[in-house]
Amino acid sequence: MHELNQHKIAALLPQRRAQSNKGNYGSVAAAAGSLAYRGAAALCVESALRTGAGLVYLASVEPVIQLVLTRTPECCALPCRTDADGGILAADAAAVRQRFTEKPAVLLAGPGLGPSAARILNALLTADAKWKAAVLDADALNALAAGELGQFPLLPTNTVLTPHPGEAARLLGCSVAQIQTDRPAAAQELAERYLSLIHISEPTRQE
């Protein structure tokens, strides 16, 4: 187990070369947002851009994309149809997965997906998916904890889970107090259970 802080993480970010372009710095495909939770997608896109991704694609419903493009016009839009719950239609999520088969990207999924999360994730995480890595947060973690992604979820080899203490408790089937009592042990158990890298964030509200 390795303890990271903001200084160590900053040192890991590659320096930009003077002679380079956005194609030299990788791609992120974000599946985020829904009619009810639009701001989550904006935060996803901005975070990916600020940490150095060369190309950031957003797969979401049209009203969410319109909002995000007013804040980050450099984002590449992948408009999706809206399902009955106001989220991304699963068939369109499958098309997003297929789009990145030949030119793999990092998948960022979960924030703001709402009740559609499990359907979307099951369309994105299939045996033939070619994601370089995946970062799963928020509603993706709730779907994972509820068993809606199957007994053996098809997570990419380089998957990062970023639960807050409440989400970590749901993933492990324990109380938030148990998570907070020994966060390193909880992170270790999550890593072993889901074969993923784990970052347990600080609580943003009273859990």
Task: Map each language-model feature to its residues.
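Small-residue (G/A/S/T)-rich helix-start motifs and N-terminal tracts that mark the onset
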Residues: 1-134, 142-160, 165-201, 205
